[in-house]
Protein backbone atom coordinates (compact mmCIF):
# COMPACT_ATOMS: atom_id res chain seq x y z
CA UNK A 1 0.00 0.00 0.00
CA UNK A 2 2.80 2.39 0.93
CA UNK A 3 4.58 1.59 -2.33
CA UNK A 4 1.42 2.36 -4.28
CA UNK A 5 1.02 5.71 -2.51
CA UNK A 6 4.66 6.62 -3.14
CA UNK A 7 4.35 5.64 -6.81
CA UNK A 8 1.16 7.69 -7.20
CA UNK A 9 2.85 10.69 -5.56
CA UNK A 10 5.82 10.43 -7.93
CA UNK A 11 3.53 10.23 -10.96
CA UNK A 12 1.57 13.29 -9.82
CA UNK A 13 4.77 15.26 -9.21
CA UNK A 14 6.11 14.23 -12.61
CA UNK A 15 2.87 15.29 -14.30
CA UNK A 16 2.96 18.66 -12.55
CA UNK A 17 6.56 19.25 -13.59
CA UNK A 18 5.83 18.28 -17.18
CA UNK A 19 2.89 20.66 -17.28
CA UNK A 20 5.10 23.46 -16.01
CA UNK A 21 7.91 22.76 -18.46
CA UNK A 22 6.00 21.85 -21.60
CA UNK A 23 2.84 23.95 -21.35
CA UNK A 24 -0.42 22.97 -19.76
CA UNK A 25 -2.83 23.00 -22.71
CA UNK A 26 -2.90 21.94 -26.35
CA UNK A 27 -5.91 22.99 -28.41
CA UNK A 28 -6.70 21.37 -31.76
CA UNK A 29 -8.73 23.37 -34.26
CA UNK A 30 -12.34 22.32 -34.83
CA UNK A 31 -12.37 23.10 -38.58
CA UNK A 32 -14.85 25.98 -38.26
CA UNK A 33 -13.08 29.08 -39.62
CA UNK A 34 -14.48 32.40 -38.42
CA UNK A 35 -13.41 36.04 -38.61
CA UNK A 36 -13.34 38.22 -35.51
CA UNK A 37 -13.03 42.01 -35.69
CA UNK A 38 -11.22 43.53 -32.73
CA UNK A 39 -10.96 47.19 -31.81
CA UNK A 40 -7.81 48.59 -30.22
CA UNK A 41 -6.19 51.95 -29.62
CA UNK A 42 -3.67 53.29 -32.16
CA UNK A 43 -0.13 51.93 -32.41
CA UNK A 44 3.17 52.69 -34.12
CA UNK A 45 4.89 49.38 -33.35
CA UNK A 46 3.77 45.82 -34.12
CA UNK A 47 5.25 42.73 -32.43
CA UNK A 48 4.27 39.18 -33.37
CA UNK A 49 5.08 36.31 -31.02
CA UNK A 50 4.30 32.76 -32.12
CA UNK A 51 3.18 30.86 -35.21
CA UNK A 52 0.71 33.34 -36.69
CA UNK A 53 0.55 35.02 -40.10
CA UNK A 54 0.23 38.81 -39.99
CA UNK A 55 -0.79 40.91 -42.99
CA UNK A 56 -0.05 44.64 -42.83
CA UNK A 57 -2.42 46.76 -44.91
CA UNK A 58 -2.95 50.52 -45.37
CA UNK A 59 -5.84 51.76 -43.27
CA UNK A 60 -7.09 53.27 -40.06
CA UNK A 61 -5.38 51.81 -37.04
CA UNK A 62 -7.32 50.05 -34.33
CA UNK A 63 -9.53 47.66 -36.26
CA UNK A 64 -7.91 44.23 -36.50
CA UNK A 65 -9.28 41.21 -38.35
CA UNK A 66 -8.47 37.83 -36.79
CA UNK A 67 -9.13 34.73 -38.93
CA UNK A 68 -8.96 31.42 -37.07
CA UNK A 69 -11.00 28.40 -36.13
CA UNK A 70 -13.75 29.30 -33.68
CA UNK A 71 -12.35 27.35 -30.74
CA UNK A 72 -8.90 28.95 -31.15
CA UNK A 73 -10.04 32.58 -31.21
CA UNK A 74 -10.14 33.06 -27.44
CA UNK A 75 -6.46 32.13 -27.10
CA UNK A 76 -5.22 34.66 -29.67
CA UNK A 77 -4.23 37.86 -27.88
CA UNK A 78 -4.16 41.33 -29.46
CA UNK A 79 -3.08 43.96 -26.97
CA UNK A 80 -1.93 47.57 -27.26
CA UNK A 81 0.21 49.11 -24.54
CA UNK A 82 2.07 52.42 -24.82
CA UNK A 83 1.41 52.54 -28.55
CA UNK A 84 2.77 49.02 -29.13
CA UNK A 85 0.57 46.28 -30.58
CA UNK A 86 1.47 42.75 -29.48
CA UNK A 87 -0.05 39.73 -31.21
CA UNK A 88 0.51 36.45 -29.38
CA UNK A 89 -1.00 33.25 -28.02
CA UNK A 90 -2.09 32.86 -24.41
CA UNK A 91 0.72 31.68 -22.15
CA UNK A 92 1.12 27.91 -21.75
CA UNK A 93 -1.28 27.22 -24.61
CA UNK A 94 -0.27 25.47 -27.84
CA UNK A 95 -2.60 25.96 -30.81
CA UNK A 96 -2.81 23.31 -33.51
CA UNK A 97 -4.90 24.50 -36.50
CA UNK A 98 -6.58 21.93 -38.72
CA UNK A 99 -4.90 20.84 -41.93
CA UNK A 100 -4.67 23.58 -44.59
CA UNK A 101 -5.90 26.17 -42.09
CA UNK A 102 -3.84 28.99 -40.62
CA UNK A 103 -4.25 31.73 -38.07
CA UNK A 104 -4.11 35.12 -39.77
CA UNK A 105 -4.31 38.62 -38.33
CA UNK A 106 -4.81 41.61 -40.63
CA UNK A 107 -3.37 44.82 -39.20
CA UNK A 108 -4.18 48.23 -40.74
CA UNK A 109 -1.53 50.92 -40.31
CA UNK A 110 -1.30 54.62 -41.08
CA UNK A 111 2.30 55.09 -39.96
CA UNK A 112 4.62 52.60 -38.31
CA UNK A 113 8.07 52.78 -36.74
CA UNK A 114 8.86 49.17 -35.79
CA UNK A 115 8.01 45.59 -36.80
CA UNK A 116 9.26 42.65 -34.74
CA UNK A 117 8.75 38.91 -35.09
CA UNK A 118 9.63 36.26 -32.51
CA UNK A 119 8.99 32.62 -33.36
CA UNK A 120 7.91 30.90 -36.56
CA UNK A 121 5.23 33.26 -37.83
CA UNK A 122 5.22 35.38 -40.98
CA UNK A 123 4.71 39.09 -41.59
CA UNK A 124 3.91 40.51 -45.03
CA UNK A 125 2.10 43.52 -46.45
CA UNK A 126 -0.05 44.72 -49.30
CA UNK A 127 0.73 47.97 -51.09
CA UNK A 128 3.82 49.92 -50.02
CA UNK A 129 4.78 50.50 -46.41
CA UNK A 130 6.07 54.08 -46.22
CA UNK A 131 8.07 55.42 -43.29
CA UNK A 132 10.76 57.98 -42.55
CA UNK A 133 12.46 55.59 -40.15
CA UNK A 134 11.67 51.90 -39.74
CA UNK A 135 13.11 49.14 -37.53
CA UNK A 136 12.56 45.48 -38.45
CA UNK A 137 13.66 42.42 -36.50
CA UNK A 138 13.30 38.63 -36.59
CA UNK A 139 14.21 36.31 -33.74
CA UNK A 140 13.70 32.63 -34.52
CA UNK A 141 12.65 30.96 -37.77
CA UNK A 142 9.95 33.34 -38.95
CA UNK A 143 9.92 35.36 -42.19
CA UNK A 144 9.24 39.01 -42.96
CA UNK A 145 8.46 39.93 -46.58
CA UNK A 146 7.65 43.60 -47.20
CA UNK A 147 7.36 46.28 -49.86
CA UNK A 148 8.93 49.32 -48.23
CA UNK A 149 9.89 52.91 -48.96
CA UNK A 150 11.90 54.55 -46.19
CA UNK A 151 14.59 57.12 -45.63
CA UNK A 152 16.32 55.08 -42.93
CA UNK A 153 15.98 51.36 -42.22
CA UNK A 154 17.41 49.18 -39.47
CA UNK A 155 17.10 45.42 -39.68
CA UNK A 156 18.29 42.45 -37.65
CA UNK A 157 17.97 38.66 -37.80
CA UNK A 158 18.83 36.35 -34.93
CA UNK A 159 18.37 32.69 -35.80
CA UNK A 160 17.28 31.07 -39.06
CA UNK A 161 14.58 33.50 -40.13
CA UNK A 162 14.58 35.55 -43.34
CA UNK A 163 13.84 39.17 -44.19
CA UNK A 164 13.06 40.14 -47.80
CA UNK A 165 12.54 43.81 -48.48
CA UNK A 166 11.39 45.08 -51.86
CA UNK A 167 11.28 48.79 -52.53
CA UNK A 168 13.76 51.49 -51.62
CA UNK A 169 15.68 52.84 -48.67
CA UNK A 170 18.27 55.59 -48.70
CA UNK A 171 20.25 54.44 -45.68
CA UNK A 172 20.22 50.88 -44.39
CA UNK A 173 21.84 49.19 -41.41
CA UNK A 174 21.40 45.43 -41.11
CA UNK A 175 22.80 42.57 -39.06
CA UNK A 176 22.49 38.79 -39.27
CA UNK A 177 23.43 36.54 -36.36
CA UNK A 178 22.94 32.88 -37.22
CA UNK A 179 21.82 31.30 -40.49
CA UNK A 180 19.18 33.77 -41.61
CA UNK A 181 19.14 35.57 -44.97
CA UNK A 182 18.57 39.26 -45.67
CA UNK A 183 17.55 40.81 -49.00
CA UNK A 184 17.65 44.61 -49.06
CA UNK A 185 17.86 47.71 -51.25
CA UNK A 186 19.92 50.78 -50.39
CA UNK A 187 20.57 53.83 -52.56
CA UNK A 188 22.87 55.99 -50.43
CA UNK A 189 24.53 53.98 -47.65
CA UNK A 190 24.62 50.37 -46.47
CA UNK A 191 26.14 49.11 -43.23
CA UNK A 192 25.98 45.31 -43.06
CA UNK A 193 27.18 42.78 -40.52
CA UNK A 194 27.07 38.96 -40.66
CA UNK A 195 28.01 36.67 -37.80
CA UNK A 196 27.52 32.99 -38.62
CA UNK A 197 26.37 31.32 -41.83
CA UNK A 198 23.73 33.84 -42.86
CA UNK A 199 23.83 35.96 -46.01
CA UNK A 200 23.00 39.54 -46.91
CA UNK A 201 22.26 40.31 -50.56
CA UNK A 202 21.55 43.84 -51.68
CA UNK A 203 20.37 45.80 -54.66
CA UNK A 204 21.23 49.36 -55.53
CA UNK A 205 24.59 51.09 -55.66
CA UNK A 206 25.09 52.76 -52.28
CA UNK A 207 27.91 55.29 -52.23
CA UNK A 208 28.87 54.42 -48.66
CA UNK A 209 29.48 50.75 -47.91
CA UNK A 210 30.61 49.30 -44.58
CA UNK A 211 30.70 45.48 -44.59
CA UNK A 212 31.98 43.00 -42.01
CA UNK A 213 31.59 39.22 -41.78
CA UNK A 214 32.54 36.66 -39.14
CA UNK A 215 31.97 33.03 -40.06
CA UNK A 216 30.90 31.46 -43.33
CA UNK A 217 28.28 34.05 -44.19
CA UNK A 218 28.47 36.43 -47.13
CA UNK A 219 27.52 39.96 -48.18
CA UNK A 220 27.00 40.38 -51.91
CA UNK A 221 25.32 42.54 -54.50
CA UNK A 222 22.39 40.91 -56.24
Named regions from a protein language model:
Residues 1-222:
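Intrinsically disordered, low-complexity terminal regions
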